[in-house]
Amino acid sequence: MLRVAVPNKGSLSQTATHILEEAGYRMRRDSKDLTSWDEQNDVEFFFLRPKDIAIYVAKGHLDLGITGRDLAADSAANGVDELLALGFGASTFRYAAPENEEWNLNKIEGKRIATSYPHLVSADLAKRGIQADVIRLDGAVEISIRLGVADIIADVVSTGRTLRQQGLSPFGDVICTSEAIIVGRHNQPVTDEHQILLRRIEGILHAKNYLMIDYNCPKSLLAEATKLTPGLSAPTVSPLADDDWVAVRAMAPRKDANQLMDRLSALGAEAILATDIRIARLTR
């Protein structure tokens, strides 16, 4: 049986649960449930604090976990390996200071830095050869400067709205670029059970990023048309009742769909359709 950790709350929780449901897994029915067993797929899900997930996986108590890259780096150091990036929950981890003050990384030396990610900050300071006092807080880090607890902060930045509300501005290099990821124990062999779950979720991600393009095309323009729609390996080309025309089908990036349809139309293709892909299994 596979044992998988899922965030029980926070920005990653709802999307992670939704992706697993789309991948065919039975999730908890009550938000208060701490575990859920999917008998059909022989997977038990554990709903845990996002910050604790990498710790459980690193120690071998759970096989896989969904968490943030920043959380994994802070809580488990080198104890877990990133197996799959999930493409949601994007953020950066930055130093920030009052926006009316001039700050750079050279000014951090000897200062007080408030953060909920002490290991991540300490590792960054050590890499830069900077000595500073790292103060661990469990939340509301942005208010610590106003309260006199810290000189600067290091925190997750998504939109920057919370920082601006507190009169703060990020500075210096990005410490960590984060998103939701699936982690496994460091150097743990990836078993067939692992692969099934990873491929299912990967299929959901591909379905969100791609769609299927269908169109009719004169044979004389086929070479040019298929340059626009090469597909994954090659497009599917089928004969039509009119021997001078063929039907073409190919996967294409969702973000390029409208421009691609415009170019196919200008080339001379007809009956151009774009349809969603619900789930996919790709070899590459």
From Swiss-Prot:
Its main location: cytoplasm. InterPro entries: ATP-PRT_HisG_long (IPR020621), ATP_PRibTrfase_cat (IPR013820), ATP_PRibTrfase_CS (IPR018198), ATP_PRibTrfase_HisG (IPR001348), HisG_C (IPR013115), N-reg_PII-like_a/b (IPR011322), N-reg_PII/ATP_PRibTrfase_C (IPR015867). GO terms for biological process: L-histidine biosynthetic process. One of its GO terms (molecular function) is ATP phosphoribosyltransferase activity. It comes from Corynebacterium kroppenstedtii (strain DSM 44385 / JCM 11950 / CIP 105744 / CCUG 35717). Coiled coil: none annotated. The keyword DNA damage does not apply. Its EC number is 2.4.2.17. Pfam families: HisG, HisG_C. Its cofactor is Mg(2+). Gene3D superfamilies: 3.30.70.120, Periplasmic binding protein-like II. The gene is hisG. Catalyzes the condensation of ATP and 5-phosphoribose 1-diphosphate to form N'-(5'-phosphoribosyl)-ATP (PR-ATP). Has a crucial role in the pathway because the rate of histidine biosynthesis seems to be controlled primarily by regulation of HisG enzymatic activity. CDD domains: PBP2_HisGL1. Belongs to the ATP phosphoribosyltransferase family. Long subfamily. It is found in: Cytoplasm. It catalyses: 1-(5-phospho-beta-D-ribosyl)-ATP + diphosphate = 5-phospho-alpha-D-ribose 1-diphosphate + ATP. Keywords: Amino-acid biosynthesis, ATP-binding, Cytoplasm, Glycosyltransferase, Histidine biosynthesis, Magnesium, Metal-binding, Nucleotide-binding, Transferase. Pathway: Amino-acid biosynthesis; L-histidine biosynthesis; L-histidine from 5-phospho-alpha-D-ribose 1-diphosphate: step 1/9. Feedback inhibited by histidine. This is ATP phosphoribosyltransferase.
